[in-house]
């Protein structure tokens, strides 16, 4: 294929599809993805996905986890912050083309990223509400987004569960009671399914359940091997050591380019304005400085930052913890 016919697939949010189309992007109905032909074009830079990682790109810890998972064993991964746990899952999915894989993420942000980086056609990537919606639709049932999982559980005897060889759970620490019940349904319909659960109890974001997650995940996996990720690619050695001391776990920082800089709100706004919206995740109080910065970005750059921009915030009750 000549350079002029090289195809470049893009990661275009639904809210920005008209903009991409106006710049010359085309729609691939089979992949359900926007693309363009030719040499790399700066017009599409903000939608250009990051390169897909290969097995050889991973650390020794990450490669050992994939090697263990490929033996067919259940695996529990205790991964420190910034250790590339989600990236490792994505590479694993690309490494097992012979398996029918269900990869469950906790939120939409992770789902979008995973769909872009997993090229294998044998992998279903979705969040929990998306999986419930898919199953309900096949059973000719419907529910509002907030009732999807409850409706799934109420009608579980009517639902014909798809068959899977491998269940991958990302961010298992955030599993809630209803999600735990959904996972049990998946396992019941696939009694010999292999399970790989990846997470870090120290990074638990959602804490609105009485479910004892460590007890549940131990029972759910049954017989399993444990792998630990200790290398943090996000922090330098000093910061990682401090955080590890606070959390009481080993974290080895390997990113010596990492630095912490104190900025005022105007400086933060100017800095974020230069970043890709897909690279930004905001955590903080809805009534705090985070919201003020986001409002400033929307006022100053409405075409780039608007209500469709993906970000996460903790509840106001948790903001002081």
Regions found by a protein language model. Name each.
Residues 1-55:
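Accessory DNA-engaging acidic/polar modules
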Residues 23, 120-121, 222:
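Short, structured coil segments at secondary-structure junctions
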Residues 24, 30, 75-76, 165:
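Active-site-proximal or metal-binding-adjacent scaffold patches in catalytic folds
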Residues 24-26, 123, 299-302:
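Short aromatic/hydrophobic-glycine micro-motifs
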Residues 50-74:
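Conserved pre-motif I regulatory segment
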Residues 58-60, 74-100, 105-112, 129-131, ...:
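Conserved helicase motor core of SF1/SF2 NTP-dependent helicases
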Residues 69, 151-165, 186-190:
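Short basic/glycine-enriched coil/helix segment immediately N-terminal to the Walker B
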Residues 105-108, 112-113, 117-152:
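Inter-Walker segment of RecA-like/P-loop motor cores
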